Regions:
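Bacterial N-terminal signal peptides
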Residues: 6-15
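Positively charged n-region of N-terminal signal peptides that target proteins for export
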Residues: 1-4
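Sequence/structural signature of beta-propeller domains
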Residues: 19-188
């Protein structure tokens, strides 16, 4: 299984003062291969440590921590080495599997927890790294009407420290968005 990380190598520039996006120029391509059945189906990437660290979220329910090596000039990726494979727990304290493993997006909260949005069994859970202790952000039934393969698709940290989650398909032309400011429920 392999995943292309060409997206991580793109440079985005805006034309000075015009507000018009310039053409994207690829800086290079790297084909990432890793052993194991859990690798692949990557839904989200988070690059940190000044470009030397990576968290990758798989829709198969695994989170990969990796180290990125680059060419001497600091640009082109030369190697990505998985240093840890983590398996989140579901609401019952069991490793995610089947219907409960469809992870779509992640965001690091101001509390340092990694928050993961799941699509099929729609939920958002915070996890302590590296032990993956689960901290549900809502009750078991909160998002039951969204269960299936059209649940959460995007998750981000807001400037005020809260989280925003967006549903995959529009409802009446608008994308349902949920906001969380801590606690045990989400506002729509």
């Amino acid at each position: 299984m392999r995943a292309c990380l060409a997206g991580a190598a793109w440079v985005i520039a805006l034309s000075a003062g015009t507000g018009v996006a310039a053409e994207l120029e690829p800086a290079g391509q790297f084909v990432w291969r890793a052993p194991g059945e859990d690798f692949g189906g990557l839904s989200d990437l988070a690059v940190g440590d000044a470009g030397a660290g990576l968290l990758a979220l798989s829709d198969r329910g695994s989170i990969f921590r990796a180290r990125i090596s680059r060419a001497a000039d600091g640009g082109q990726i030369t190697e990505i080495e998985v240093t840890a494979t983590m398996r989140p727990e579901d609401n019952f304290g069991e490793p995610v599997s089947g219907f409960r493993q469809d992870a779509e997006d992640m965001a690091v909260g101001p509390d340092g927890r990694l928050y993961v949005a799941f699509e099929s069994y729609a939920r958002i859970t915070g996890f302590d790294l590296p032990d993956m202790t689960a901290h549900p952000t809502h009750g078991w039934e909160r998002f039951r009407p969204l269960w299936g393969n059209e649940g959460f698709e995007a998750l981000t940290t807001l400037a005020d420290g809260g989280l925003a989650a967006v549903i995959e398909n529009p409802d009446g032309g608008a994308y349902r968005t949920f906001l969380w400011q801590g606690g045990t429920d989400w506002d729509e």
